């Protein structure tokens, strides 16, 4: 699992996402943070139980977060490489896809409750609850996601020689200029999966078995 790999993939295949760069060197990371013409977020590249993203209030906090990961050992090996990227304004949503090569089924959009404090404040958690369908993901938003995120992503996987079969979690930020990718996961969302499973009318096990065997019926 690597957010740095994901960022490079998104750039390579022109999938909308936040501006940003990957760093293993603290001096270069600090220079980027201080020169960035926008507020930034700091992400540990590896797995961190949904808690590896720091949303600083200012550049001083951003530099401190970068140092904690690259020099202080925060998140262990997962923090040895970081992603510094533009803080996007908008509302997040989770899009789960059942993918079989160039075919896919999109499950209802969902949202989870991340912040630990009342009124959506405080540090991020791994998710403390979820609901679906998410009203913020309108038809227009989902059409945008299909055309500008999913299509180039699946084309990119094919170009990389990856016959992807399974769940693809696309975390998006719905901004004024369209949906942008926050993250990819190759699993169901947690806790989003708990509210999505009851909404799947077909047999989930049969669906997953079909995908594993390369015969997804997109009309299911």
Task: Enumerate the language-model features and the residues they cover.
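Conserved N-proximal alpha/beta basic substrate-recognition cap immediately N-terminal to
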Residues: 1-17, 24-35, 40-41
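Conserved beta3 strand of the protein kinase N-lobe
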Residues: 20-22, 95
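Conserved aromatic
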Residues: 23-24, 56
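Residues within well-ordered alpha-helical secondary structure of globular protein domains
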Residues: 35, 68-71, 210
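Conserved anion/nucleotide-ligand pocket segment
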Residues: 37-59, 196
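Internal nucleotide-binding/catalytic subdomain
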Residues: 52-193
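C-terminal catalytic subdomain
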Residues: 199-212
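Peripheral (often C-terminal) accessory segments that flank ATP-dependent C-N-forming ligase machineries
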Residues: 210-220
């Amino acid at each position: 699992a690597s957010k740095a790999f994901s960022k490079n993939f998104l750039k390579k295949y022109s999938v909308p996402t936040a501006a940003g760069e990957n760093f293993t060197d603290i001096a270069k990371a600090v220079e980027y943070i201080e020169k960035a013409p926008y507020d930034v977020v700091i992400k540990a590249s590896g797995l961190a139980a949904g808690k590896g993203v720091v949303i600083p209030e200012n550049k001083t906090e951003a530099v401190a977060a970068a140092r904690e990961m690259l020099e202080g050992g925060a998140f262990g090996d997962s923090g040895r490489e970081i992603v510094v990227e533009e803080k996007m304004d908008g509302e997040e949503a989770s899009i789960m896809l059942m993918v079989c090569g160039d075919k896919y089924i999109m499950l209802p959009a969902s949202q989870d409750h991340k912040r630990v404090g009342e009124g959506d404040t405080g540090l991020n958690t791994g998710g403390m609850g979820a609901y679906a369908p998410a009203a913020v993901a309108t038809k227009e938003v989902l059409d945008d996601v299909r055309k500008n995120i999913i299509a180039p992503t699946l084309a990119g996987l094919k170009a990389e020689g990856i016959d992807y079969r399974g769940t693809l979690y696309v975390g998006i930020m719905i901004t004024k200029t369209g949906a942008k990718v926050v993250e990819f996961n190759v699993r169901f969302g947690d806790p989003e999966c708990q509210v999505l499973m009851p909404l799947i009318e077909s047999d989930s096990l049969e669906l997953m078995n079909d995908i594993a065997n390369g015969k997804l019926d997109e009309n299911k």
